[in-house]
Amino acid sequence: MSLVMISENVKLAREYALLGNYDSAMVYYQGVLDQMNKYLYSLRDTYLQQKWQQVWQEISVEAKHVKDIMKMLESFKIDSTPPKASQQELPAHDAEVWSLPVPAERRPSPGPRKRQSAQYSDCRGHNNRISAAVRGPHRPSSRNPNDKGKAVRGREKKDQQNKGKEEKSKSTSEISESEPKKFDSTGYDKDLVEALERDIISQNPNIRWDDIADLVEAKKLLKEAVVLPMWMPEFFKGIRRPWKGVLMVGPPGTGKTLLAKAVATECKTTFFNVSSSTLTSKYRGESEKLVRLLFEMARFYAPTTIFIDEIDSICSRRGTSEEHEASRRVKAELLVQMDGVGGATENDDPSKMVMVLAATNFPWDIDEALRRRLEKRIYIPLPSAKGREELLRINLRELELADDVDLANIAEKMEGYSGADITNVCRDASLMAMRRRIEGLTPEEIRNLSRDEMHMPTTMEDFEIALKKVSKSVSAADIEKYEKWIVEFGSC
């Protein structure tokens, strides 16, 4: 439960009460009291519980005052209604006093009539004279001055209505312009479209290029493949068209997925995060439809980057005895969509491109045709000594370090460690001071520790202990295998 939300709701309730909008104020007061009840149940500290109970009592008193005001206003409305006059209260009829005239009904004026006879007109004039004598002398109408005011008010009202209509139409047009474009799912299953739309990363992963240590060549290539074609669309045409596919190869934990997150953050393109579960279905023929739908949606939302992590699980080598017919059809559809006759057509505008960014730890299992379509195949190696030191600085930038910590010395000791291994070492070392502080304490004593007591600087000894506990996860034989493959099939 967010304390900021509770305070904001209390503020709104009080503002509505001050403005006289008591109905809205009561809604907010009721919501605040419910939120505070939930928060009270989650508290373990008795002192804090007492404080919050006092606050709850004060808020409930305020809500009661607002409720009393609402009741009082309601009683005013009931008392102010005039009582209907009964027949007995009417004054007695006096025979010598004329009764009030019955209000005449206004009827629409009839159309042109035929000329009436003289006899009828004489009778009508005679009757008019009698009625005029009965009514008395003619008096000037008292409604004339107000007619002008009514006309002015009518014009003002009409102007306000026209103005309101213009503002409404303007706001609706602005809303329609600000609304994101929606893919037309005609001809496709609605559930399939929604499943793929969920894989569009609309939230910002918040990973910048500076958050990735080393890997200068990989970052340069991704910028050239994704960012530059949008900045210089006139240049990237013909033979200089942007790369359609980039394959990142390397041992686990070297930053391949992190590079994809940086592309999603920095490149401002529509980013599809696709896995094998996204493109597989138990129904026959539906997986191929998913692949085709994915690329059609990517072209609609272009410029687009489709990131396929662990692509070897989707598009492994064809023709093996263990291959199933369904997976073979999915691979064929993926290859056609990437570079087929009816698939990835070359658009004249390079800013509307669709790029496939793939990552794998088993490049030797990928199909040859897919390897050809992934035009750039780059090796993401283990971090160098400079990269390891930079990684240590990035991971430890929020921690307080002791004066005896030498990051260059620690980086030398971590030769052969991947980026994920270095992060694990930093995490383990950062917890050492806390482990020493709570050793031998009861749970109640641990709960009562202050924040300053827990935030102690990490020492060089902590890193040495962490290095003994965390070993490297990549063997030298694996590194040799990756380097041999990249020498044979690499395209940096």
From Swiss-Prot:
Listed name of the protein: Katanin p60 ATPase-containing subunit A1
HAMAP family listed in its UniProt record: Katanin_p60_A1
User: Which reaction is this enzyme known to catalyze?
Assistant: n ATP + n H2O + a microtubule = n ADP + n phosphate + (n+1) alpha/beta tubulin heterodimers
Indicate the quaternary assembly: Can homooligomerize into hexameric rings, which may be promoted by interaction with microtubules. Interacts with KATNB1, which may serve as a targeting subunit.
Ranges for region Disordered: 80-186
Instruction: Report whether Nucleotide-binding shows up as a keyword of the record.
Output: yes
The family annotation for this protein states: Belongs to the AAA ATPase family. Katanin p60 subunit A1 subfamily.
Q: Which GO terms describe its biological process?
A: cell division; microtubule severing
Disulfide linkage: none
Identify the main location. Answer: cytoplasm
By what means is the activity of this protein regulated? Answer: ATPase activity is stimulated by microtubules, which promote homooligomerization. ATP-dependent microtubule severing is stimulated by interaction with KATNB1.
Residues annotated as binding ATP: G250, P251, P252, G253, T254, G255, K256, T257
